[in-house]
Design a protein with these regions (language model features):
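Extended, helix-rich architectural segments
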Residues: 1-200, 515
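Short secondary-structure junctions and interdomain/linker hinges
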Residues: 44, 165-169, 178-185, 298-316, ...
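Glycine- and charge-rich intrinsically disordered segments
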Residues: 120, 126-137, 293-303, 307-310, ...
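Long amphipathic alpha-helices with heptad-repeat character
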Residues: 130, 134, 144, 360, ...
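Generic amphipathic alpha-helical segments used as scaffolds and interaction surfaces in large
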Residues: 149, 161-165, 173-174, 279-289, ...
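Extended, regular secondary-structure scaffolds
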Residues: 172-280
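Extended, charged amphipathic alpha-helical segments
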Residues: 260-393
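C-terminal helix-loop subdomains that flank or include functional centers
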Residues: 323, 330-331, 339, 355, ...
Length: 515
């Protein structure tokens, strides 16, 4: 951006001229363009301070000043500062109940000419060998099968693309960061691999990794623009600030030069969508900060009290006659001589600090329950023993309540992911085989501790036997079968072979050949 453009932009702003977001970027006025967006990094920095134990309020506890009888300062004594990583524990438990196991992707695309295929299969079965109609039917079936295989192959390519990009690991990372910073983003970008083939990669953006996130949503909560701020170091060892700004039609790479001016490089967004999934939520330990502060203060005070009584202290009820010859700290003492009727004993605690311990236990319960977090102590887990999946569900009801609340948003995030990845496959990764955006892809959240698969299969068999479920659906619910489509083809072949054997036996029986 030239000096002339800088002056022009300043004059326009001074006279109240409203430039659009894209006009500001095109004119090189990146600062004003970024100011039109919501800066997520400020709030993220505040949340990180609450998350990290070393920056908790208790860590600012002032030392105790020790004074003499006249009020003069003798020394200062450091007090205990016990910070408890409740946010870490609460966030990790919430993460496990959302993405402890990867989400399941399912292909619900209607298979083309399915009814026609079924009619041809039935007609094919009743025709005798040698009938010229068989060749025509086989050709039609092969054509229909090719169309259906293209859909299946596209869906498999979709799943392979996510697997190669390590989506399951990245979505966990993005959820973990969002639970800490209240906002994170998965940035999908494409590059060429060592063989020159296009490939998709995912980068999780977070303030803890020095990324600044800026968003612009419309009134319907649709993402209109996204900006990523970051720093690099040039060849002269100077820090260079960057903004990558994404819209559905364009991508701008902005680099700040010396003097504050910007170099702006615009490129077409070939994907056709903003290649970002933004995760937004409240911190997982929301509204428990005051309880956490109180627990940390109580435990620190208890530790101070324990320190005061940890070293033995003598109490004499009369004058010690041989006090001039008392042993030094490093020496052993054997005898104290006191006046008649006197006594010497160690100072002992009488309160046992029960009230404070009770308070800490109650606060701990409140923190976990109000953040919808189960108390997964070793004792509690031992008590569960060989619990079934249903029993674990009841025990983890608080975590499931929170997970169900998160799924209201994450259901949309996963739907956006499938739409975005299909657009990337159509427009960048696999252009010759376009058609991925026509796929109907659904998803399911997996149970964190796995499902009671044997019970599910038993119920599915009962429903199938009663006529309420197709064989194909039964195969899809079986944990013993990896590919329901392949297994269905095998069953069809077995049925055809069985039918042929029956026809052959009937012919042999008609001629009196069968034994």
């Amino acid at each position: 951006m030239s000096v002339f453009n800088v002056i022009k932009n300043e004059l326009k702003a001074a006279f109240g001229y409203q430039q659009t977001f894209e006009e500001l970027i095109a004119n090189g006025d990146i600062r004003r363009a970024i100011n039109m967006m919501e800066d997520r990094s400020v709030r993220a920095a505040e949340c990180i301070r609450d998350y990290k134990a070393e920056s908790h309020k208790i860590m600012k506890r002032e030392p105790k000043i020790v004074r003499d009888k006249e009020g003069n300062i003798i020394r200062s004594k450091e007090l205990n500062k016990i910070a408890i990583p409740y946010p870490l524990y609460i966030n990790e438990i919430a993460l496990v109940f959302m993405y402890g196991r990867p989400p399941k992707w399912m292909n619900e695309t209607p298979m083309p000419r399915r009814d026609e295929r079924a009619q041809l299969d039935m007609e094919r079965k009743v025709l005798e060998e040698g009938n010229p109609r068989i060749a025509e039917i086989d050709k039609q079936i092969a054509s229909i099968q090719a169309e259906q295989d293209r859909i299946t192959d596209r869906f498999q390519k979709y799943k392979d693309t996510l697997k190669d990009a390590r989506f399951s690991a990245h979505v966990r990372e993005a959820k973990r960061v969002a639970g800490i910073e209240e906002c994170s983003a998965m940035l999908f970008h494409c590059r060429k691999d060592s063989r020159g083939n296009p490939t998709m990669e995912i980068k999780v953006l977070s303030k803890m990794e020095n990324d600044d996130i800026y968003t612009m949503f419309d009134q319907y909560d649709h993402l209109v623009a996204f900006a990523w701020g970051y720093n690099t170091v040039d060849a002269a060892n100077k820090t260079v600030h960057h903004y990558d700004i994404y819209m559905a039609n364009k991508i701008w790479k902005c680099e700040q030069r010396r003097g504050g001016q910007w170099n702006v490089f615009a490129e077409e967004n070939r994907i056709g969508k903003i290649p970002v999934i933004v995760f937004i939520q409240k911190v997982e330990w929301e509204q428990t900060e005051s309880l956490i502060n109180r627990v940390e203060k109580a435990m620190s005070s208890t530790a101070d009290s324990n320190d005061r009584f940890s070293d033995p202290r003598l109490v004499a009820t009369a004058e010690i006659l041989n006090k001039d010859r008392l042993p030094k700290e490093e020496e052993e003492g054997e005898m104290f001589i006191v006046n008649k009727g006197g006594d010497v004993h160690y100072l002992e605690r009488t309160d046992n600090n029960e009230a404070r311990s009770t308070e800490i236990d109650k606060l701990d319960d409140q923190i976990l329950s109000k953040s919808f977090t189960p108390n997964l102590t070793l004792e509690a887990l031992k008590g569960l023993g060989q619990a079934s999946g249903a029993m674990l569900q009841r025990y983890m009801v608080l975590a499931n309540i929170k997970a169900d609340k998160h799924k209201e948003k994450h259901d949309e995030y996963l739907s956006r992911t499938s739409s975005l990845v299909c657009a990337i496959l159509d427009n960048v990764l696999d252009i010759p085989n376009r058609g991925y955006s026509d796929l109907v892809i659904s998803h399911e959240f997996s149970e964190p501790f796995g499902e009671d698969v044997s019970q599910i299969l038993t119920d599915a068999i009962k429903q199938h036997n009663s006529g309420g479920m197709s064989t194909e659906t039964l195969l899809e619910h079986s944990y013993l079968i990896k590919d329901a489509r392949v297994e269905m083809e095998r069953l069809d072949r077995e049925e055809e072979e069985k039918l042929k054997r029956q026809q052959m036996m009937m012919q042999m029986d008609a001629f009196g050949i069968a034994k």
